[in-house]
């Protein structure tokens, strides 16, 4: 944006529009009942009252720690989400190396029969509440290798899945949208009982 020589005030960048929801064309969260209720209470009274469970749920959505379970080419697309162009950490979604420190596991790629026990073991090491994002056609249902004798036809046969991200491979935008949907799901339902 070029400065206007006739004005004496500072140059101000336009307000960020956020990531648009492809279904509505509006920024994600614009019609979220949670945010609408908070906005209404703040405009009405200047403060809002919440239960401790609501506060914990709100805090949990902004501090999700994720770990990768990258098995194939989808893991390369998953790496892009942490890079400066998408920067998933601005949404409170930070990577961790250990399952004991992680809230979310992203399964990306073809899950084979030999790798299935390792997936379950890593999932069991994660603390409660724990969430799983299945990324890509291979993780969702076997994908291109669906009819192979050595492939699990969807990682939901091994661990419970909260969000499915379709595509072969899905783009970084699709994974980012899946992360935002997971945060919305946690806000809406609180702790997901297993």
From Swiss-Prot:
Tell me a Gene Ontology molecular-function term this record carries. NADH:ubiquinone reductase (non-electrogenic) activity
Q: How does it sit in the membrane?
A: Peripheral membrane protein
The protein's required cofactor(s) are namely: [4Fe-4S] cluster
Q: Ubl conjugation as a keyword?
A: no
Q: Name one GO cellular component term.
A: respiratory chain complex I
The transmembrane segments are none
Q: Name one Pfam family in it.
A: Oxidored_q6
Location in the cell reads: Cell inner membrane
Keyword 4Fe-4S carried by entry: yes
Positions annotated to bind [4Fe-4S] cluster: 73-74, 138, 168
Its top-level enzyme class, in one word, is translocase
Supply the InterPro entries for this chain: NADH_UbQ_OxRdtase-like_20kDa, NADH_UQ_OxRdtase_20Kd_su
Keywords of the record, alphabetical order, are: 4Fe-4S, Cell inner membrane, Cell membrane, Iron, Iron-sulfur, Membrane, Metal-binding, NAD, Quinone, Translocase, Transport, Ubiquinone
Give the cofactor note text. Binds 1 [4Fe-4S] cluster.
- SUPFAM superfamilies given in the database record: HydA/Nqo6-like
S-S bonds: none
A biological process (GO) annotation for this entry? Answer: aerobic respiration
EC numbers = 7.1.1.-
Q: Which superkingdom? A: Bacteria
Reaction catalysis annotation: a quinone + NADH + 5 H(+)(in) = a quinol + NAD(+) + 4 H(+)(out)
**Family (UniProt):** Belongs to the complex I 20 kDa subunit family.
Give the matching PANTHER family: NADH DEHYDROGENASE (PTHR11995), NADH DEHYDROGENASE [UBIQUINONE] IRON-SULFUR PROTEIN 7, MITOCHONDRIAL (PTHR11995:SF14)
**The protein's assembly and partners:** NDH-1 is composed of 14 different subunits. Subunits NuoB, C, D, E, F, and G constitute the peripheral sector of the complex.
Function of the molecule? NDH-1 shuttles electrons from NADH, via FMN and iron-sulfur (Fe-S) centers, to quinones in the respiratory chain. The immediate electron acceptor for the enzyme in this species is believed to be ubiquinone. Couples the redox reaction to proton translocation (for every two electrons transferred, four hydrogen ions are translocated across the cytoplasmic membrane), and thus conserves the redox energy in a proton gradient.
> What protein name applies here?
NADH-quinone oxidoreductase subunit B
Taxonomy, top ranks, is: Bacteria, Pseudomonadati, Pseudomonadota, Alphaproteobacteria, Hyphomicrobiales
């Amino acid at each position: 944006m070029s400065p206007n020589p006739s004005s004496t005030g500072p140059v101000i960048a336009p307000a960020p529009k956020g990531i648009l929801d492809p279904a509505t064309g509006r920024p994600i969260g614009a019609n979220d009942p949670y945010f609408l209720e908070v906005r209404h209470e703040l405009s009405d009274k200047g403060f809002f009252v919440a239960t401790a469970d609501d506060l914990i749920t709100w805090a949990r959505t902004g501090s999700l720690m994720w770990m990768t379970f990258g098995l194939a080419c989808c893991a390369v697309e998953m790496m892009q989400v942490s890079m400066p162009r998408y920067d998933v950490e601005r949404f409170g979604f930070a990577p961790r190396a250990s399952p004991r420190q992680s809230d979310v596991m992203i399964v990306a790629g073809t899950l084979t029969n030999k790798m299935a026990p390792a997936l379950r073991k890593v999932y069991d090491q994660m603390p409660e509440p724990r969430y799983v994002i299945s990324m890509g056609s291979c993780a969702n249902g076997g994908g291109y290798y669906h009819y192979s004798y050595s492939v699990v036809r969807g990682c939901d046969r091994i661990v419970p899945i909260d969000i499915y991200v379709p595509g072969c491979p899905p783009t970084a935008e699709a994974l980012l949208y899946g992360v935002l949907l997971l945060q919305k799901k946690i806000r809406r339902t609180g702790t997901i009982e297993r």
